[in-house]
């Protein structure tokens, strides 16, 4: 969280006028008794007279409490007007990673984690392990893959244009959360709100890029930097 706040004050205030994030609708699916599914429709709009570009992964959401050096859409949850200082309320899948803390056997824990990750990425466990082995054993491969992944996440919006996305998020209906030393219990009848944000970075992500790709990005004048926030919208976390 501190990183996000520092980056916010570092960026020029005019940056907020370049990119607008708007939550359009949130659709609820209660067909699963263990999870509540939210489909969030949101729009990114270039409000300037020229093309803008930025690193962004639209199909992955993360809690804003996890830090800002990432390309995911960040979200914050509020109860009434109070920011909830907790992580793990919403996730990109139904996988419950909190259960891993109860698995004492390291080998069993890694098998369970691999299965969860493979399911999320829609790949086989063997493919996941092979990829991980290459990354950990070959620094050049890691740098190449990291740069390739980041460059493929570039979003470009022409002048005065917009693009709409949909993202599914899941809530496991738990009300007690603990993040570091923070404990929180979600009120059963309180109104809750979600707010989305993008931290558009450039030089700050140079460590993930090859020297050639970083040079390309550095010389691209359409790349924007800034902290962009959406409207707050009601999200149903009631009992």
Where is each model-derived feature located?
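Bacterial Sec-dependent N-terminal signal peptides
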Residues: 1-23, 42
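Short acidic, flexible loop segments centered on an aromatic residue
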Residues: 55-83, 88-94, 120-144
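Asparagine-centered strand-capping/turn motif at beta-strand->loop junctions
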Residues: 30, 42-51
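Intrinsically disordered, low-complexity Pro/Gly/Ser/Thr-rich segments with frequent PxxP/GP/PP motifs
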Residues: 84-119, 123-126, 140-179
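Low-complexity, acidic Ser/Thr/Pro/Gly-rich terminal tails and inter-domain linkers that flank the onset
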Residues: 17-34, 235
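Terminal connector regions
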Residues: 136-144, 155, 166, 171-237
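Short, solvent-exposed loop/turn segments enriched in Ser/Thr/Gly
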Residues: 34-41
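A mature extracytoplasmic/lumenal domain signature
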Residues: 48, 56-58, 169, 198
């Amino acid at each position: 969280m501190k990183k996000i706040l520092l980056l916010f004050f570092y960026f020029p205030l005019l940056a907020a006028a370049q990119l607008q994030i708007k939550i359009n609708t949130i659709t609820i699916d209660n067909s699963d008794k263990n999870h509540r599914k939210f489909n969030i429709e949101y729009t990114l709009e270039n409000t300037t007279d020229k093309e803008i570009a930025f690193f962004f992964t639209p199909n992955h959401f993360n809690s804003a409490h996890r830090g800002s050096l990432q390309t995911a859409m960040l979200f914050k949850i509020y109860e009434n007007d109070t920011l909830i200082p907790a992580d793990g309320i919403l996730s990109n899948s139904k996988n419950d990673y909190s259960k891993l803390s109860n698995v004492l056997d390291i080998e069993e824990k890694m098998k369970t984690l691999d299965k969860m990750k493979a399911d999320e990425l829609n790949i086989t466990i063997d493919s996941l392990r092979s990829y991980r082995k290459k990354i950990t054993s070959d620094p050049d491969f890691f740098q190449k893959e990291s740069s390739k992944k980041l460059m493929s996440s570039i979003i470009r919006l022409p002048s005065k244009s917009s693009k709409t996305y949909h993202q599914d998020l899941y809530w496991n209906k738990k009300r007690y959360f603990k993040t570091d030393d923070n404990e929180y219990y979600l009120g059963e009848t309180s109104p809750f709100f979600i707010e989305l944000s993008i931290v558009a970075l450039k030089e700050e992500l140079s460590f993930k890029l090859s020297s050639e790709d970083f040079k390309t990005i550095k010389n691209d004048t359409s790349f924007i930097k800034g902290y962009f926030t959406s409207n707050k919208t009601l999200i149903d976390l009631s009992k």
